[in-house]
Amino acid sequence: MEYKTHDLSKQSCSVSAALLFQAGEWMYIEKISLKGYRNLNEMTIDLKNGINIFYGANAQGKTNFLEAIYICASGRSLRTRNDSQLIHFDAPESHIQIHIKKENRNDKIDIHLKKENKKGIAVNGIPIKKLGDLFGTCHAVIFSPEDLNLIKEGPGERRRFMDMEICQMDAVYYYNLQ
């Protein structure tokens, strides 16, 4: 299998993106642009079908880059509930944009974050009113050290994890959880 590497200490370059499968439909992220997001103040990366390898020294933004993708899939950070913490310290707001290529269509997700903890989400240029309307556009599963709680903690933690993953594939499931 072909792969390319990407050093996150550079501002912009071309890399390969992992091919994702969901219910027989393939998808991959073609492009991601970040502006005013955590320590990745401004970057655009064009992705191609294949495998991603992101590398760099500590505190270069590898986890922040993956978190930005997760936010586009779920509408939420995996590390904080306070969206203002996602904004670069000297920026008034943050913007995340991803272009997704799917078997039958292309989608674009825009996330705008403001210091007042205001968030705007648009799919293909259309603002969404409910978080559940985002689900199904981009699929992402992230495992972090905190996910060891899936094994250590009780069944409630495992249910929460599975609920969030299923919500990405079925917005109706999300609304039924409410």
Where are these regions (language model features)?
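Short, cationic motifs built from Arg/Lys/His that form the positively charged side of catalytic pockets
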Residues: 38, 158-159
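Short coil-to-helix segment of the ABC ATPase nucleotide-binding domain corresponding to the Q-loop/switch region
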Residues: 66, 157-158
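Nucleotide-state sensing region of NTPase/ATPase domains
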Residues: 73-149, 155-157, 163-169, 173
